[in-house]
């Protein structure tokens, strides 16, 4: 085996720290040299001292590590910005694990993966500093300007190009949109080069909005008329304050049924549940799909709602990775697809105003791949919600309100994948970015458990601010509810309800994150087999578990309840009692004079025991705002002329949403990503 120098060893060791390999294990690999094994025999490795590293989990995580010459002697983890009941609880265990492993080779803590990954990354930074080296893929230097979110297009040295690939279409990013694009091109006979900076196709969760089609026909939900579909499109335009393009929404709405049938075709083993809560056979537990809100709550009529949530959605369970990977495999099986995983596209190639290819860096070798794409390039690179500079520029309120990002996908260098690099690539090539971006921050209720499900979701029970005052019509969907919470003191409030909640839930709207079904189960084991309790369904055991965990407060009297939720503020306690009394009067009168909440969702809070759970700001799931586009997935220059050969799909496709994420169609972002990936593939190959 070839020996490596001590300098080389240290560099490799620091890089390995990022991926969890111990320094002593690396030293053992350098056999034949007494000095090379000194890591396990006491040779100095570190510069003694205390070092600090930071990384982003739910919020900023700080790790401070103290080193002797040969060991990590102390670890301090500051997870105060994490969810207290999740990341905060995990911190002591993570400290012990780092000390025991003497590296970042530690197991993830179930339910606290985001915090664990952040701690590992911050700890790796400490190790790098102590060893006096730096590895690629770290955070951008703090000294760079926050305004410099676009950066400068790199110059690629042709001498570093180790491989040249000639194809019809290059696809950048293998999420839902990119995978759909690959399959679309390949099945039409085009040659595809697929670039992805992670180690394979990427996806999260599994909700899709689907209008009509064979899949929806399985549940009799394929009966949407032209007029109803156009009403859905109108609602979307209103929610986006008419800052998006109707043509994009319309083409999707009228064609998604057939496209979704094509998508699930790739997964012939997919099991179709009869209802939202049907039992699932053991052999199908890892690959099934449910209709969301089927059957609908008995009192829900979307036609009568001020904020309708249309019964169009389905969800892949436990998530959609089986279907996404099946689609990618179906594309590869055509023989027309080359995949380049772990490769970072750094520059588009433009000739006479047309996009004709790209340069990508292979993370494994540091060398470049030049891809000539005769028909064009499809950008499907996702959003930018882990890029603080871009957030500050495009959605400053996300930063101002201290909204934390929920995103766990990482590239092969250990960094989050959603960095907005597609926007940078496109803008360097002359494309324009849309205005009025839409952060997805729909509230799912207070007192969330490890799965992110709130105690009663965002169901419209009474809500009081930190002074004990009522401040809104509580009959709001998650996004609008979040907007109201952000306006309150400390951006917090209390949801309050009484023991009659089981009778009241069926009157709540079937909407994003809201509890609207009651189930009388004593434990999850009593529920449908292999179909864990869905977020819109609530049973008494769940509420009592929330009380036991401290995620909800319970009291026999209202006086006791307000004393618990406002423990050091007697003025707030009295104001809260007055607010509840006023609310009860309005409920009994049948008309909400204060906030015009529908009488059908106003109930007096008067039968103990009483409950409360705290609302804080929700998490940012994705920040939707991309390059200006249209229903053919084109991009546009500063004069709004089409840029030939440059297409977009997924979150990088602009003008789908604007201002804020709409709540009328659960899973519409996934659905439009898949559909327009399909469209982009066909259009690129045909040069449309």
For each predicted feature, which ranges?
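N-terminal secretory signal peptides and thylakoid transit peptides that target proteins
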Residues: 1-20, 24-27
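Active-site- and interface-proximal helix/loop "cap" or "latch" segments in soluble metabolic
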Residues: 41-141
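Conserved N-terminal glycine-rich FAD pyrophosphate-binding loop of Rossmann-like flavoproteins
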Residues: 198-221
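Conserved redox-cofactor binding core of oxidoreductases
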Residues: 252-367, 388-389, 586-607
